[in-house]
Amino acid sequence: LLLTLPYKLVGYWAMPILNSAMVAGAWILLFRVYDIRPSRLVLCILIVLSLQPIYTSAVLVDAWFFPAIILLLSARRLPEVYVGILAGLLLSGHGSGQIFALVFAVLAAVLFRSRRQVVAGMVAAVIAFGMNVLLDAMIMPETPRLSKTFPAARVFSVQPELLRREADRSGNLVLSEAADEVARIKTYPENKGRRDLFWDVWKTSEGEFDLAKFEEHHALPILKDAFMFEPVPLARTIFLDFLSYYGPATQFDFQPVLSEPFPERFYASHQAKGFFAAVPVESVATILRYGCYLAFAAALFFGWRRTGADIRRTIIGIGLIAIANDALFALLSGPPDRYHHRILPLLAIGTVLLISGRVKQPVEAPA
């Protein structure tokens, strides 16, 4: 909805222009709320290390996560209801938005004891959920939300036996054929680490694999079975997926071959030519990502003692949001790393706050 008018004016460039304006505005808001003036050079370096320019220019959902969190942080100085509404609109870009709004509300209550931030988080959760329901009803009324299908697909991509067991239990021939297809796909070495084999099955089924029926009748039994049928290997895979986000390999989600049709110009783009899947590009991204980790760790080591209690609580909150983000997507999807990458700018926030020393503490505005 936010892109409708800009898209009519400037076409494709509407997304990077709008995202850039939001991200820049979020940084400015952070400086005003915490009354800091960081070095422009240091700030630019941190922004590059956090891979923020890539996602701001190319991915709507992950670019909006950053300004949404800063808006919620600013609720101590700004009207909490309006802040919550704006943050909720941004977080509604992904189904996990309401979860993280609630996570923020809990952290605000525990760490900051800030009623205003709690209210902002709760309002954001309601708005994000409401917008998702509204958009689904307007745009895809016949398609289920697949809230159970995605985690079910994640577990049977790791353990194809789960899909086979559900096919045997239900007597569903399509599921039986899908189980055979998953087992076949996993025999290829390049698919060993994939957690999204569901889409391969769906594409090759030529419409026989009914998403609505799978969501309603089969996804939940598969999830329940996952906790009973060899849960230890599954738990180990989830834990290793969590650790892989911090490992030396970087996997972007800019796939060269997409399932949905795109304008003709896409097929002449760097993405379609496999630029983002090239080893040199992924290696540079890994170096930058580790630079972001090291900058945050160094700022934490040298700046922790000379910052005020409020900033320390903010840093702890940022760390917990980052862990919650990675834990959620290790559980639900696993690699690629784009969902981990969206917490890198939060580490850049923490670094800026720590190196800014004893910044002026934001005073909560009267209710």
Regions found by a protein language model. Give the residues of each.
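Loop-to-helix entry region of an early transmembrane alpha helix in multi-pass inner-membrane enzymes
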Residues: 1-25
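Multi-pass, polyprenyl lipid-linked donor-dependent membrane glycosyltransferases
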Residues: 15-21, 44-71, 89-103, 339-344
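Transmembrane-helix signature of polytopic, membrane-embedded enzymes
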Residues: 30-50, 63-67, 80-82
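Perimembrane helix-loop-helix junctions
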Residues: 100-129, 349
